[in-house]
């Protein structure tokens, strides 16, 4: 059986991603359409939108494409080095834009706000990292500091390092965030032990530990919301 593959240029103008973006704005486009604009062209038998859909499914969405190595993407049929470079550059722009909101004194009002600030960058890391978000009295971000790299372990984490920048900045509070490279954000017993130690140290330093978030693949857990290590109000 012969399959007839429609090229993007043969689609009606209302179905072409660039024309739809011009008419309706980028927010109106599906993920595959946005990615197709970056890719520009597909490969024999597959147009750019179809290639974009395949990539998003194959790699598990934007976070999977972020995690994928350059060579892994470049060797994929229909990609190559030029398309891979364009895609990686666009993903990095998105990451930096999100982090820039912290530099503009982004205000954190909920665990979701904190997770959105950190998730794009931290969900693709191969190693566990512990970071502290330093906040002022209005919960505005002062600085995000990486304080530890490696499996969270009560005997290895230096609690003083968690608060070092917060003390220097005279922060009112911190939110602690770490990732699980496995993708499962369920806090471990060790996570709970370390969190209790940080909460106690924060009390002594008069710096409130507002929450400890565990980041997974597209998901997160707020230990305060779960009542883990934190006393429920």
From Swiss-Prot:
Keywords: Hydrolase, Metal-binding, Metalloprotease, Protease, Zinc. One of its GO terms (molecular function) is metal ion binding. Zn(2+) binds at residues 178, 180, 191. SUPFAM superfamilies: RuvA domain 2-like. PROSITE patterns: MPN, UPF0758. It comes from the Bacteria. GO terms for biological process: proteolysis. Residues 107-229 form the MPN domain. A motif (JAMM motif) lies at residues 178-191. Pfam families: RadC (PF04002), UPF0758_N (PF20582). Belongs to the UPF0758 family. This is UPF0758 protein Rcas_0037.
